[in-house]
């Protein structure tokens, strides 16, 4: 049954419908503005209210091409180097999005080590509502590797007194240890 499809290839009407469906632009979507937000806003911290269709992105690509000069002929003529007018495109500045739509990272905004030290009443009533990221100050002009080397103070270790780990003499079995060395040498003959 290899090569068996629901519409046979020699069926000219089905073949023409398949070609038309695959080449007609955006006819498979009933509403081309289905994902366009009615009140768009500018989000400084992440993609909010973005567009997911080619209708809204097409004008942005055209403006981007005009600003980069992609559509112009590479020429030294002053007439060819004149910038194109952007008056044919409608431009607007969107309002800023509300702060409730900003992304929130619970692990970074509320680290677990802040919560571990709290007891139950403090957690319910007096939880310290501060942003730990606000206290971070990074001075990028300071070479921290050299600063760490300069501020390092060596900690010299003091050896432990090891007399406490020596074997103890058992009472009643004390014996003096003596070492004897035989120092007689055979004479050379």
Swiss-Prot record:
Keywords per UniProt:
Virion
Instruction: Indicate where this protein is primarily found.
Output: virion
**Location relative to the cell:** Virion
GO CC annotation, single? virion component
Family from the record: Belongs to the mimivirus R457/R459 family.
Protein name in the entry: Uncharacterized protein R457
